[in-house]
Amino acid sequence: MNMVHKIMANEEAFHLLLAIIIGVIGGLVNMFFLNFVSLIQWLIFQNTGDSAFLAQEAKPFLRVLAPILGGILAGLILLLHSHLSGKKKPTNVLEVVALGDGRIGMRSTLISAWSSLISIGSGASIGREGAITQLTAAFASKWGQTHEWQPYRLRLMVACGAAAGLAAAYNAPIAGALFAALVLVGNFSMNLFAPLVMSSVVATMVSRFWFGIDPWYVLPESMNFDQATNFTSMLWFLILGITSGASGAFFLKSIQKMETISAKSPWP
């Protein structure tokens, strides 16, 4: 007990302890989410795997019908929730960490996660990392609200949840920690960065315990790394980076434009 009291008295050590627990939550969220996705895929396709594999193996009518019906059902869930719920708490992780007090709406997050589950399980080509990151951050926020943490601690733990969720989803602890530090917290000071790293590493360890250490994306066996690192290849990588950045900016602008148009439309 003396050790526990010492850890709780030292704020930085206490934050590391909280980060470890949130990392475990992130790994478990990833495990349950992906298993539910596999269950939905099996019910629809009698098969499991990524969207491309399912489309290749599925019957022709299912390739078209399953994503359409899944998208309609997922949209109806969100639409029904928006009509039945009153004033909703924010669910955007960046918003609650950078501008808010770290409070995330749990109900809205769970509804959004169910919608994502149905979309992904029915073959939609959307990323799983968004829902897993959001769910882990929401659980961290709910835990902190239950214990009445101060806003500065609550924001940090929500960022740890986002880092853990992303790290577990992609088996990438460094990416999870850097994402939270750069995008959410915007600070690399050790007292903030260390908990993010701890959550990411623990979440990845829990995820690897269940799914193994294999990477999500496998490079072709024919790839020659000596050729990939010569000067000519570097020029192509430079062009690829510029093109990817421009495409990403265009995509984000397009989303913002469509959100503006949708908000003005009377149609759901």
Where are these regions (language model features)?
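Alpha-helical transmembrane segments and immediately membrane-proximal extracytoplasmic
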Residues: 1-268
